[in-house]
Each structure stands twice: as structure tokens, then as C-alpha cells.
């Protein structure tokens, strides 16, 4: 059931007299009345998922305008009187933006738009010149043409943005290749920025070339025509993930009234516009203002997409769109649930003022703010008392317990948690609450974006790894939502006992998401439910934060060992999204599905998930490999053959440095310095943070015991060979139920228990550690009066342990033969350590299986 229908159902059921949600202002005059809009004077900016005029959010409520038949001089927009009348009528119907899709309009048109309070999106027609990349004969100076067009309207206050082009034909893009088209558009983007640095730049894409990666654009625009509301809603969610932290604008949507009828057009445009804004779009352009349309040297009469007829008489769709535009982003009356916003703080005086000021600007009808001061020693409490919020002061007990204190005090159906160094978008709660109204999710999160103006270090930290990210299973369902921006149904959060108090600094959000999903509940994600999140503004603070995250990882691994792999990293089922993600070496080539003859209507880019091998250089444990090679290089003083480790050491340092440089080169800064030296310095600092982050995490992980040689389970005497045993049970139970009981029993001991895949010949694996494990296979025979339960268990030794041990032993033997005692002893100790650790981990795993089966034999199952 589409989101729009679910929200409509909620509207019908809402109580009369509910307080309305405040919306971004929209002209709402009746048709024929003078325009109510204020003439545009300020330049626009893109901030996070939305567009702003100064500090005021602008929802683009637009229509396309043209193309029209040119006059004898080739001027398409020559009838000034008609333009004046059209723009006045647009403003009277709640339209605030006009898109000129194919030709650069004269400056006169922008002046008229400004008089009527309209913004204009102008097209630079890059698609008309792309063919010259194939055949350069008689090619014009494309850059000069673009510069001339930009100069004709640069700096105009009515300018919304420049569109580099509109729908480069899929066959041409396929001929040229993806990278060549991307480079072409990037270069034109740079040309526009050179002429108008403050102007916003986009490219109007469409589903057939969705695969183009254009991260440099200021906003993302797509033309999408779908007659199915379900498919439209699903595709919008996909486009939001492509847009990432940038605004998404529907640059064209519509329906042909000739084929479907004017009533069907009105109904379709109503749900298209409402669905787009409910999905978090920053704006919508309806195609088109009028049925008058001229293309390729002739009037187009086979289609009628206009809101008005060619003579400008209105269709039913015009009133439908006017009403939909007046009610963005949501219907004005919904049964909005009461929300309790909980802010937990400890010595947060530097940022909590911004946080509370942002909460006061929320456009939501029914919410309370609870601030839990977790033992602050600065003037945090004094700042909080200056705001109309509820303050609860406690001794310092840690973040998770502070969150639980807020939960106990909350009166809302929904509990929304916000960090004290973050502040929300005015419609933050609106988008999150709408998701709760339309789904059964237990929790909903949204993106967190670093604001501009926090300084060079904070800007670099925002582009470095280690920030709060979200993990998505699908375009709308999450596996993890970060703690700085997460909301819960209070009943669901109370049902799992709230947050685990052992997590004092970090990790509580990961734990609570896993516990909710363990209960069979789902997590949602809304791309427009965003908050602005200040990053650390000093290298020391960033280092300390990452150490804390490393310790939290170790604590989570102890509680959820089955969620981690052998080296100690989370095995996410979904994809990680967010800024500052470290680059990886991609061994698997990305593919584009073009369809037969390149005719697939939706052509997506498919990228394989990074493999363990390609991800190794960015892992904290890579530094242990580097340290081991450095140790061998030092031992070469005692035994010269170990000098071979020196080139390996140099080789091992190349991947992390290369990936750090690549990540810094790809970073886009919110306020890029103009001086060359400052730009280089900022990227060098970003690269240094990419290198430092895994090291800080490694330190935190090691301090908390998360080491590659860690052990799960209690050591106990157990055989190191295959063991078969059986027991008789007079109580019949299904085979899978006995396995589930064994799994739960062993996990209760705090060990890591994994299930075999569909192609494995074993049922469960008990991981003793990185060097040893044990596996079991269960069989159940049915007999009169009971069941015979058979179990076979055997140790499993990964190849890495014996290989490392044999390598060290061989080197130790060589050093001993050359009478290099120091090197021989050091290498021998390493070999012995791995051997003993493997034995210990295998016996611990076998002992765990034996204890669980003994309990099963006693009838505990």
C-alpha cells in the first residue's frame, strides 16, 4: 500500500481540531487574484537535502515552460506579454519556480519571473553538443558556448540553478561509455562554476541513464514518468540513496490528458506531487504549464501534458496541483503522534545552545523536549534553563542510562533521540512521524549531515571515516540507524528493556537496533528526516572519539559474537551509507544493466560488495600486519635473511596510504578554499585522518580485548578429534527445535555460534577464536516410544593458523641453524604461541559443545 494512501487513511481517521503542521510558505491566492509571492532577491543554496533562500527553506513547486515556436530571429521566448500573463497566472496558483528545459531564456524572462516571485531553472543544453565527442569535425567551442550562456544570466536573483543538460540519449551514452560522459559533464560543471561560483548546478537525468555517477552536482534532478503509485514511491526511495546528502528534485513528472482524460490527469498529478514531497524531495516540476509545445520544427499535437490548454484555459489538473502544492510536504491535518525529543548531554555547553534553538524551530504540532544532563561539570545546565524544555540532572552514569532516564520521563508515543552536538531540520519530526504513521517500523532514522562553517578541521573530519552512518537492507528498510538521529515507538523500546547500560559512550545504538530486529521488528529510514551534526573540531577530539568507538566495538563483540567475523568486524547484511566512507580497492568490476540493444527503461549500476581482501587495507588490523613486518625488519639486525621483510613492509604501507589519498581526493568540501595552498592543506589533513582513524580504533579495540587472538568460551579438557555420541529421549521433538535449543544454550555462555549454509555438511559452528573452532552435526532417529539423538562434533582449524605457525617455525629453524639465537627464539615463540592458541581455542569450542549436549541428554531441552 503506497505511503500516500496510508497517510490519506490516517487523515480520514484523525480527530477534528488537531493543530496543523506549519509548512514552508506557499502562495495560495485564488485563481485570478494578484500574486502573493515576494519577489526573489537572495541567491539560493543547497544545504543537506533541501534548498534555501537565506535561512528559509524553499520547496520547489514548479512547472516546465516551453519549448515554443521561435520567431524569425530564432528567439523562443519573444512574446513578452504572454510570458507576463503566464507567470502571473502561475504565481496565483501557488507555483514558485519555472523550468526552461531546452534553450537559454533571455534575461528579460528572468526579470519578469522576479517581478512575480518566481525562480527559474535554466538549461544549458549540453545534450545538444555531446555528439561532437564522437565526431569532432566542425565541432564548435562547447566551453565557450556554455560560458556565453552562463554570463547572460549569472548572478540574477531569480535564478534557481543551471541544468547542464537534459537526458543525454541512452544510445549515445552507451556509445561513448560511462566515464567519458561523466568527464564531459564534470568539465562543463567546472566551466559554469568559473563563471558563476555561487550558482547551483545540476544535470537532468532520467532512469535510462541512472547509472551515471555525478557526485559533483549541487542537486540531483530526474525526469520520472510512472503511472503506478507503488513503483513511483519505490523509485523515489532509490533516487534518494543516489542523491545521498544532496537535494533531490523531480525535474519532470506528468500524465498525458489526451490518452487518459483530464480527470485522470488531475488525479494522477495529485498523488504524484504529494508522493514526491512525502518521499523527501526538495521540489517538483510538473510537465508542463501548457499544451502549447513546439519541438523539432513543428507543433506537437499528439500529447497534452499541460496544466492549461494551448489557449491557456485551465484543466482540472491545475486546481489539483495548486491544492497539492499548497499542502507540502504533507497534508495539513494528520493524526500526528505526540513525540518526546530526548537530548542526552555531558559537558555539551559548546553545542547544546544550537541544539535547543533548532528544536524550538521544529514545525511539528505536538512534542516535548527532555534534556538529560548526565553529570555535566560545565555550564550546560545553565544554558538549558534558558530554554522552554524539561531538564533532568543526574550523576554521570553514561550515555545509555541517560537515554533510559529520558525514556522513563517521556510522555509521547514516539521517543526521538538527538545528540547534543546536533540540531534538526525544521521538518525533522514531520518526516519521521509520517513514516511511523504509514509503516509498522519499530524505529525510524534519517541522515546526519555536517553543517558548513565549523572550521577547516571539522570539515576534514566530516570527510574522514568513523562518523555516524546508517546501514540499509533496502532503499527504505534499515539494519542500523545512528544514535544521533533515531526515533522509536515507546512501547517497542520498553518491550526490549530500553538501552543496555554497559554502553557509556557509544555502541548503545547498534545494540538496540540488533535487539529490535532480533524480536522480528523492522527499522525504517527516511532520507528527509535529517539533522545537522557538528563533527569534532580538533584532531585530538577526533582521536579520542575513534578510540571510544573502538572500545564500543569490542563491547559489542562480547555481547554479539555471532555478528562478527574472525578478525572482529561486523558482518552487515546491508550496505553502509554516509559521508567519509573509506575507499576500497574494487576487484569486482561494476556492471550496468542496459538490456537487449540498450533498450532497458531503467538502467542501473550494480557494484559488488567489497570483499574481505579488498577491505583489509582499511581495517585496524592491517596496522598489526605492518607492525609485524616492522618487527621482522628489526630482527634482520640479528639475522640478515629477514631483510626480505623490509620491501614487504614498504609494500604493506602503500595500500592504506593510496586509499587515504584517494578518499581525500574524492572529498567535496562545503566551503572549498579558493587559495591553492589551502585546498591542498585541507586534502592532506583529510588523508592524514583517513590513516589515523583505523589506528585509533585499533587502540580502543585492543584496550577492550578485541584482538585477533581473543578466545570465546571457557577452556576445559576436551578431545581434539572427531567425537560421536548419542542419547535417548522419550520426548519427541523436531530436529530443528533441538538444534535451536543447542544454539541458544551455547550462545548463553557468551560464545560465537554460527549456522551452516545451505551447502554445508554441518549444522552449527562454535568459534573458539581466530585460530580454532568446532563444528557439530545432529541427527534424530524416530523409534517407538522415543527418539535417538546422535551428535558428531569435531575441531576445525582454519588454514591461516597452521600456515603462520609453519612459516615462523621454518624461519626459527633457519635462524637457529645460522646461530642467530635472538631471532630463533623470537620466531619460535611466535610459532609456539599460535600452536598453543589454536589448541586452546579448539578445546574450548569442543568443551562448549559437550556441555550443551550433556544438558540436552539430561532432558533440559
What are these regions (language model features)?
Residues 50-60, 64-220:
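Active-site mouth of glycoside hydrolases
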Residues 174, 179-278, 306-308:
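Extracellular glycoside hydrolase catalytic/binding regions
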Residues 287-335:
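Aromatic-rich peripheral "rim/lid" segments of glycoside hydrolase catalytic domains that contact
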Residues 357-366:
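Short, acidic, metal-binding catalytic loop of nucleotide-sugar glycosyltransferases
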Residues 358, 373-382, 419-422:
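A conserved acidic beta->alpha catalytic loop
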Residues 415:
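Short aromatic/hydrophobic "clamp" motif used to bind/position activated sugar donors
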Residues 427-458, 522, 528, 534:
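Conserved donor NDP-sugar-binding/catalytic core segment of glycosyltransferases
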Residues 446-447, 461-479, 494:
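Short, flexible, basic/aromatic active-site loop/helix in glycosyltransferases
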